[in-house]
């Protein structure tokens, strides 16, 4: 068997594109003004000038530590987002077991009146700045059990919520999109209070 000229050419892998939006065919975040500004500055000067506030905000969005508060079936989908198919850690979003080491709390499931003080206590133990993602219909507004005497009609009555992820249960893709929205929100509003 001889080698043909086409067989001697090395195979070149395609460049990774990240998460591609199926409706546009472009990577998610390609239209983000934050990245456009950085790319234009790098192309123009070859280096980036920034402020300490912007640097801290950039570092914070790339190293968010989340704590689970899984209360019902949404917690199963929340676990899926850490598995290899979605691998949320590639976005700098890693799980932690302690609220004292967490920046983000994901409330997933039905919050009852009896569990509400525990939720608030865990939230108060988190260091500032802290963020909350409400995941699923039950956490957002009581869901299927909305009219029950024992259910809190939304975890936003107990803790301030930054991102709402709708669905019953929401898919892992929806939670991943919520994480990306939280990172975008942090970049937009910053984290340093004066």
From Swiss-Prot:
Keywords carried by this UniProt record: 4Fe-4S, Cell inner membrane, Cell membrane, Iron, Iron-sulfur, Membrane, Metal-binding, NAD, Quinone, Translocase, Transport, Ubiquinone
Compartments reported by the entry: Cell inner membrane
UniProt topology in membrane: Peripheral membrane protein
Cofactor remark from the record: Binds 1 [4Fe-4S] cluster.
One Gene Ontology cellular component annotation held by this UniProt entry: respiratory chain complex I
Catalytic activity: a quinone + NADH + 5 H(+)(in) = a quinol + NAD(+) + 4 H(+)(out)
Membrane-spanning ranges: none
GO biological process: aerobic respiration; electron transport coupled proton transport
Main location: membrane
Any one GO molecular function term: quinone binding
Residues that, per the record, bind [4Fe-4S] cluster: 73-74, 138, 168
Cofactor(s) recorded in Swiss-Prot or TrEMBL: [4Fe-4S] cluster
One matching Pfam family: Oxidored_q6
UniProt xrefs under InterPro entries: NADH_UbQ_OxRdtase-like_20kDa, NADH_UQ_OxRdtase_20Kd_su
Region (Disordered): 1-26
EC number: 7.1.1.-
Top-level taxon of origin: Bacteria
Functional note: NDH-1 shuttles electrons from NADH, via FMN and iron-sulfur (Fe-S) centers, to quinones in the respiratory chain. The immediate electron acceptor for the enzyme in this species is believed to be ubiquinone. Couples the redox reaction to proton translocation (for every two electrons transferred, four hydrogen ions are translocated across the cytoplasmic membrane), and thus conserves the redox energy in a proton gradient.
Subunit structure and binding partners: NDH-1 is composed of 14 different subunits. Subunits NuoB, C, D, E, F, and G constitute the peripheral sector of the complex.
Family, as annotated: Belongs to the complex I 20 kDa subunit family.
Protein name stated in the entry: NADH-quinone oxidoreductase subunit B
Originating species: Xanthobacter autotrophicus (strain ATCC BAA-1158 / Py2)
